[in-house]
Amino acid sequence: MTTIASLVLAYLLGSVPFAVLVSLGMGLADPRSYGSGNPGATNVLRSGNKLAALLTLLGDAAKGWLAVWLAQTYGASFGLAAPEIAMVGLAVFIGHLWPVFLAFRGGKGVATALGVLLAVNPWLALIAAAVWLAVALLTRYSSLAAMVSAVATAVAAWFIEPGVYAGLTIVIALLLVRRHKQNILNLVSGTESRIGGKKKS
């Protein structure tokens, strides 16, 4: 029962739509109404408000980190071990992808995944961020950077955090890449928008 309750709470935390809340709180348009329509930091950046994008990024990452940190810190008292904590990390990530508060139409999960990784092992988060930054600087494609980063981090997890956390990282990477299906098609067709640019038609 404790495990189920933890997963439900993690999912609900992951469902909190910071992109929408921050945008509406700052008097901006709902990010689902422009650009890619994705409720995430990259799309919020297309509004031209860098602070809103940063706050969205921090909020989405924080909820991923908080869910896992709480499970790590207090879970042992309720019988939660590494497998259950990994499930909590997956639950908060899934909450962001398919949030109950947005009719199950959420974001791509990049920032939330980073937050989960930060709680699991800061080195994994550092690798993810470094790879994302390198690819983004070279190509200016946020989507490509996210996918390459996810795959690279999943590989690194086998050496840094073998076991259930490596499994968690791989599942997150698979889901994240799957959420970028349209971006992959856009990259192939040459219509994918670049960081700092307008969405191509």
Curated annotation (Swiss-Prot):
InterPro entries: G3P_acylTferase_PlsY. Its main location: membrane. It is an enzyme of class 2 (transferase). It is found in: Cell inner membrane. The chain crosses the membrane at residues 4-24, 84-104, 116-136, 157-177. Its EC number is 2.3.1.275. The keyword Transmembrane applies. One of its GO terms (cellular component) is plasma membrane. GO terms for molecular function: acyl-phosphate glycerol-3-phosphate acyltransferase activity. Keywords: Cell inner membrane, Cell membrane, Lipid biosynthesis, Lipid metabolism, Membrane, Phospholipid biosynthesis, Phospholipid metabolism, Transferase, Transmembrane, Transmembrane helix. Pfam families: G3P_acyltransf. It catalyses: an acyl phosphate + sn-glycerol 3-phosphate = a 1-acyl-sn-glycero-3-phosphate + phosphate. Probably interacts with PlsX. Belongs to the PlsY family. This is Glycerol-3-phosphate acyltransferase. It comes from Laribacter hongkongensis (strain HLHK9).
